Amino acid sequence: ASDYGQYNIASYTSDSYGAGIQFGLPISDIERIGLNLRYESTSIDVGAMSASQILSFTASEGTEFEALKTQVIWSRITLNRGIFPTAGQSQSVGIELSVPGSSITYARATYRHRYYRPIFGGKFILGLRGEIGVLEAYGDTKVPPFYEHFYAGGITSVRGFRANTLGPRATQSEYILDAEGNPLLDSTGQQIFNPYWGYSRNDDRSIGGVYLIEGGFDFIFRLPFLEDQRSVRTSFFIDAGNVFAQNCGNEENCSELDLGELRYSYGIGLTWITQLGPMSLALAAVGNEGPLDRTEGFQFE
């Protein structure tokens, strides 16, 4: 079982198993097509204290799902190196579909782009990145699965905001609900008040969104006191992004697709390659901050 509450997102547990096969076909020296086929069985475990959005989903769609998923990925890469590129670009488009006949049917699409170019005679490097994502239900499924939502915020996303915390917040009902979304009743037939309402374990945790817009600009420069720059990269950055819902209802920190709700940040970042893997830190200030956004002036990962 996986408990996702530790990732700053709405708390729930799930059991999932499956099997799949992958194919890859080079189209040219720089382009590739991939095809993934996977069968997946997922069980969602909800409780009386689960977020109301999760209870609403399970009331509409159930808690047990079997799906046959197909995913097509196209990529085009002209980067001059895999780590710390200084020129070229990479693009990828991914479309995942749970095929008709599955117990839950949805489509999930993403587009990612990175671009690097030396400027001022190669003394500096311009870096640009962007990502957009869309999640939609189709067929008999009315609500897109919350466990496929997009998340934003963090040192690899929109720096200056805590990881996975941007966008709609998980909310709870004033009264305790069962897995069908119905209020539980006491011995007198009265609805049972939720003692955790207003300060539950889901407070300030994101439920994610069905739309993602994210991007960043990096002005990459060398550190003058380091002779070997191959394992270190520093930059001034500007990031922007957020996740959005289809219908906000009474969700907090929520907006439907609106570029005016993009969050911004700027600052200085540093990444270095160690024997344990890449390490990153950022000093950031934020812009267009919402009242419930969780910010971090210093981040390390």
What would you call each of these model-derived segments?
Residues 18-22, 73-75, 92-94, 112-114, ...:
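Outer-membrane beta-barrel architecture
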Residues 122-245:
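Extracytoplasmic gating/loop element in the C-terminal half of outer-membrane beta-barrel translocons
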Residues 1-92, 106, 159-160, 166-171, ...:
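Gram-negative/organellar outer-membrane beta-barrel architecture
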Residues 152-160, 247-301:
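C-terminal beta-signal and terminal closure region of outer-membrane beta-barrel proteins
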Residues 25, 76-78, 97, 115-117, ...:
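Residue-level signature of outer-membrane beta-barrel architecture
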Residues 28-33, 80-89, 102-105, 118-126, ...:
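Short loop/turn motifs that connect adjacent beta-strands in outer-membrane beta-barrel proteins
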Residues 10, 48, 59-65, 197-210, ...:
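Extracellular/periplasm-exposed beta-strand and loop segments of Gram-negative cell-envelope proteins
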Residues 1-4, 19, 35-41, 89-97, ...:
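Transmembrane beta-barrel strands of outer-membrane/channel proteins
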